[in-house]
Design a protein with these regions (language model features):
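Homeobox/homeodomain signature
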Residues: 4-7, 28, 36, 97, ...
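C-terminal/domain-edge helix-coil "capping" segments
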Residues: 17-50, 69, 136-151, 156-247
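N-terminal segment of the mature soluble domain
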Residues: 53-158, 200, 204-206
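Sec-dependent bacterial lipoprotein signal peptides
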Residues: 1-15
């Protein structure tokens, strides 16, 4: 976990994190010194199952499994590193947990717009790619004061899976024009790195995969790792002596 988070935060000292992610503009050119304490908020996944009759239902056990799988995988990736302390979300007071979960929900509502900025999908947001300045507000400042954590990581995801009967229908749909198939529906994971004191979103990135599902542990691990790949690559480049210029 520490290696991944450090590599994410090292990007604050660079002019960019490669072609995938968005970095808050005012941090470009800043020192690459990372925070001493980082708080990782449990991932929030929304998984719905589509039946033969096209009704949709939330699959809560699958959502919890995906969240637990990702958390364990991310922690395993950073076990050998000790650059800074990871604050255990489970040990926070209930009021502080609720505050963080509320801000995670707020982040989730912003993802669609952040994607438009990242993909340069709407001309009016072209400036936002260069001057990225979204914020969740100062509602988490007390959590930072009480825990000493400077930064939080929010991860959200969404997927549609098929019931057995729906899979049978989609098998026929692949060879006969009898209806819309869900086989091409992409699973999606998005990550936000947030300053706890100001609420500023420091970085944002996402991963979408058509042939992966959040109900598959290996796929969850792969998507969670993919969404952080560019940031880890940036750390490796910095360690190799490469530096990025400020905008």
């Amino acid at each position: 976990m520490r290696q991944i988070v450090l590599s994410l935060l090292v990007c604050l000292g660079l002019s960019a994190c490669g072609p995938r992610g968005l970095v808050r503009s005012e941090f470009a050119g800043r020192s690459n010194e990372g925070p001493k304490k980082v708080l990782v908020v449990p991932a929030d996944f929304v998984i719905t199952e589509v039946t033969f009759g096209k009704t949709e239902e939330r699959v809560v056990p699958a959502e919890r499994q995906a969240s637990n799988t990702l958390s364990k995988h991310v922690l395993a990736l950073g076990q050998k590193q000790s650059a800074f302390t990871v604050v255990d979300f489970a040990k926070l007071s209930k009021p502080h947990q609720e505050v963080l979960l509320q801000h995670r929900a707020l982040f989730a509502t912003m993802v669609s717009q952040l994607l438009l900025v990242k993909e340069d999908a709407v001309d009016v947001w072209e400036t936002k790619q260069q001057y990225f300045d979204y914020s969740l507000g100062r509602g988490m400042a007390e959590v930072s004061t009480q825990t000493g954590a400077e930064t939080a990581i929010f991860i959200v995801g969404k997927d549609k899976v098929r019931s057995t009967s729906r899979k049978v229908l989609d098998t026929f749909a692949s060879v006969l024009p009898i209806g819309e198939s869900l086989s091409a529906q992409p699973a999606a994971v998005a990550v936000g790195i947030v300053d706890l004191r100001s609420g500023d979103i420091l970085m944002f990135d996402n991963e979408m995969a058509t042939r992966k599902a959040l109900t598959d542990d290996a796929d969850v691990q792969a998507m969670g790792e993919a969404v952080l790949t560019d940031f880890r690559d940036t750390l490796k480049s910095r360690e190799g002596g490469k530096t990025g210029g400020a905008k």
